[in-house]
Amino acid sequence: MPAARSLNDRLIVPVAPIVAEAGADTTYARFSLFDADVAPGSDIDMCVFNSANALVGSSGSGTSAEEVNLTNPAAGNYTVVVQGWGVDGSSPFKLHTWLLGSAAAGNMTVSAPASAVLGQTGTISLSFSGLAAGTKYLGSIAYSGATGMPSPTIVRVDTP
C-alpha cells in the first residue's frame, strides 16, 4: 500500500499543471485534493489528461474535495491541472497522487475465508503494519475464482 506522493506549496495561479508517470504495471491511479489542504472556503477543481492530451477524468464540485480515478491506465505521462475556481488570489494546495501496481507492498494483510457461498455473508479483515504517521495510503484487494467479482476493492487509510 503506497503512501500518497504529495506536492506541497504549489500555488493556484489560476492553473497549475503537474505530471505523474504511470508505468506498464500500473493497475489503478488516483489523484485527490482535500478541503483540509487548502485555505478555508476555497474551491479548486481538477482535470487529468493523458500523454495524447486527451481528457481522461475531471472533478469539480463546490468545494476543494476533488478526485479522479483511473482503472488500468495506459502507461505514460498524465498531466493533472488544478484550477482555482473560487479562491482569493493565490492559494496553496496539496495534490495527492497514488499509482498502484500489481506487486504487494507488504504493509497490508487480508484475512478472508477460502471460499464464499452465494447469498451468504462472510467476514474479511484487514490489518496494516509499518505505516508512517500523518500519511494517506491507498491499496487494493483483488479477488479470484469467480466472474463478476468487484475487483479491485480500493482501500484508503489515513494514519493519525
Where do the language-model regions lie?
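Feature for long, exposed domains in two main contexts
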Residues: M1, A24-D25, P73, Q83-P160
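Extracellular beta-rich ligand/substrate-recognition surface
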Residues: M1-V13, V56-G62, S115
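Acidic, Ser/Thr/Pro-rich low-complexity intrinsically disordered segments
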Residues: S6-A54, L131, S140
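Exposed aromatic-hydrophobic patches
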Residues: P17-V19, A65-T71, S125-S127
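Short, solvent-exposed aromatic-acidic interface loops
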Residues: A36, S61-S64, V155-P160
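Noncatalytic accessory or regulatory domains flanking protease catalytic cores in secreted, cell-surface
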Residues: C47-H96
